[in-house]
Structures are given as structure tokens and as C-alpha cells.
């Protein structure tokens, strides 16, 4: 079968438009940290993650604990340290599914973050600026669990 002849009808599917100052694609530890940092400074953030849990490789899906600065007197600081300390308090047996909920809870506590889980970014719309630079204007994600297309317009994007 020639893929160029494949037509997918999407017009009957639900579509939701979102507006944010910052759209972050990817809910790994870097995406979580960027979202929390920006949101705590008053930025309206939309965090799009293609998996059902946050954390990327550090989630229960991959099971790789945070292994940055390790050693006798070394440790991670900032938001990563905050997440790890919350995990030690709530999850003394180091259960991965509880770690997932710690990360999810930190994101959901923040009123300036809108979270889209199970939403894969599949398209980006760009525009050419007067100086010739090209910038992302919006991204579109497909959320398989709800059969919904999400279009996000933002001033800034991070992937």
C-alpha cells in the first residue's frame, strides 16, 4: 500500500485550543524542573508529556533513579533536590509508583501549570518574522486516551 494515498479523517474528533506563555514538550526531570521554575515566577505553563507518568527515565516505566552529582559530599540541588527530599519523606521504601505520584503532585500543586499526559506532540506551525527568523507559533498534540487533538499557542516553546 502506498502511504501517500492514506487519508485519515480527523474532522469529527474533539479539538481543544490552549494558550500559554510557555509550552514545554516533555515531562522528564528537565521538563518538570523548567515548568516548576517558570510557573513559580508567574509564567503560565503548559506541560505536554507523551506518557501516562512524569519523570522520563526516572519514572516507573524506566526505573532509573536520579544519578547526577553523587559522591561523599556531592548532591543535586534546586528543584531536583526538592523532588528527591519529598520522595524520601513520602516514599521511604523507594517504590517507583509512589515516586511517580510525588512528581505528579509537585506539578499539580502549581496553579500556573496545565498538564497534558498521554499527549504526543505531532505537529508544529511556524511563522516567519519580519527579520527573517522563523519561530514556532503553535504545536499540536494527539491525546490517545481521550481521542482529542490539543493545539497550544504560546510565546515560548521548549522541547
Where do the language-model regions lie?
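Glycine-rich loop(s) and the adjacent beta-strand/alpha-helix scaffold that form part
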Residues: 159
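Conserved N-terminal/central alpha/beta ligand/cofactor-binding core
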Residues: 2-4, 9-12, 19, 37, ...
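Alpha-helix N-cap/helix-initiation motif
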Residues: 27-28, 51, 92, 147-150
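Core beta-strand elements of the Rossmann-like FAD/NAD(P) dinucleotide-binding domain
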Residues: 18-20, 146-156
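Short beta-strand segments that buttress and anchor functional surface loops
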Residues: 138-143
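Beta1/beta-strand and adjacent pyrophosphate-binding region of the FAD-binding site
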Residues: 14-28
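N-terminal Rossmann-fold NAD(P) dinucleotide-binding loop
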Residues: 31
Amino acid at each position: 500500500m502506498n502511504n501517500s494515498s492514506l487519508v485519515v479523517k480527523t474532522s469529527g474528533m474533539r479539538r481543544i485550543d490552549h494558550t500559554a506563555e510557555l509550552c514545554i514538550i516533555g515531562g522528564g526531570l528537565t521538563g518538570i524542573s523548567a515548568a516548576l521554575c517558570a510557573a513559580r515566577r508567574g509564567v503560565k505553563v503548559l506541560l505536554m508529556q507523551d506518557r501516562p507518568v512524569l519523570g522520563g527515565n526516572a519514572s516507573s516505566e524506566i526505573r532509573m533513579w536520579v544519578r547526577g552529582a553523587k559522591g561523599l559530599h556531592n548532591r543535586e540541588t534546586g528543584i531536583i533536590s526538592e523532588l528527591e527530599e519529598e520522595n524520601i519523606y513520602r516514599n521511604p521504601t523507594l517504590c517507583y509508583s509512589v515516586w511517580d505520584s510525588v512528581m505528579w503532585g509537585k506539578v499539580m500543586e502549581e496553579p500556573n501549570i496545565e498538564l497534558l499526559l498521554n499527549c504526543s506532540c505531532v505537529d508544529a506551525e511556524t511563522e516567519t518574522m519580519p527579520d527573517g527568523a522563523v519561530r514556532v507559533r503553535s504545536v499540536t498534540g494527539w491525546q490517545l486516551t481521550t481521542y482529542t487533538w490539543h493545539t497550544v499557542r504560546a510565546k515560548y516553546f521548549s522541547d
